[in-house]
């Protein structure tokens, strides 16, 4: 337990969260544009009158709840849950040793919902960034996932274009991570970085 708490509070963990949240927010904007264009409703993390709390949570046919990143709905509004036409997850992983577990986690969250809502034949997609093994990616593709992958080196290249050293190794010091976090907090061109990453992938 103490180890988990220390890990959650570590600057390395915080830096990983920053990158993961940035990738997620980048695609939230893209999915919002898509939803407007196709007259769909995008459910994402945050408050919504139609559901409790701030999480996007759907129930499968066995009564199990699954937290998701994005759901595109037909006929949905802030006050009404629509029919699911797409379930989409996003994930950042720095090291491949965690990638297969994450792939299985995504699979476990979405596949029961696909079965539950098979009459709507929902699209299933995932945005992966960082270090993911070919096996983890192929595992998701074999299940019908559409995978958009941003390799670790490409993400680092994108950040470095704007003067931010986003890279890290196992023995990167806490002080180095604090410097990365400060650089990010001071960085004002996040929208330009979003566009650049989308362009170079």
Feature locations, PLM:
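Residue-level detector of flexible, active-site-proximal loop/helix-junction positions
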Residues: 47-51, 94, 154
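Non-catalytic C-terminal interaction segments of nucleic acid-processing enzymes
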Residues: 142-201
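Phosphate/oxyanion-binding active-site loops and adjacent basic polyanion-contact surfaces
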Residues: 19-27, 63-67, 95-105
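Active-site metal-binding core of divalent-cation-utilizing nuclease and nuclease-like domains
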Residues: 43-81
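Short, charged/polar micro-motifs that form catalytic or ligand-binding hotspots
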Residues: 13, 17, 21, 60, ...
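Interdomain/boundary linker segments immediately adjacent to catalytic/signaling cores
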Residues: 1-48, 200-201
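Catalytic cores of nucleic-acid endonucleases
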Residues: 81, 85-86, 90-149
């Amino acid at each position: 337990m103490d180890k988990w708490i220390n890990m959650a509070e570590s600057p390395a963990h915080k830096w990983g969260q920053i990158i993961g949240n940035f990738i997620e927010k980048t695609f939230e904007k893209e999915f919002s544009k898509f939803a407007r264009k196709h007259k769909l409703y995008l459910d994402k993390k945050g408050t919504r009158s139609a559901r409790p709390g701030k999480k996007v949570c759907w129930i499968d046919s066995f009564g199990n709840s699954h937290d998701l990143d994005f759901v595109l709905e037909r006929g949905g509004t802030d006050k009404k849950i629509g029919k699911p036409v797409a379930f989409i997850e996003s994930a950042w992983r720095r090291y491949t040793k965690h990638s297969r577990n994450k792939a299985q986690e995504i699979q476990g969250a979405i596949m029961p919902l696909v079965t539950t809502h098979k009459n709507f034949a929902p699209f299933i997609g995932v945005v992966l960034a960082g270090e993911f093994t070919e096996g983890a990616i192929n595992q998701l593709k074999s299940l019908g996932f559409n995978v958009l992958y941003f390799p670790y080196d490409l993400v680092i290249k994108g950040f470095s274009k704007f003067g931010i050293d986003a890279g890290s190794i196992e023995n990167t010091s806490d002080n180095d991570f604090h410097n990365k976090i400060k650089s990010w907090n001071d960085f004002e061109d996040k929208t330009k970085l979003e566009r650049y990453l989308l362009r170079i992938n």
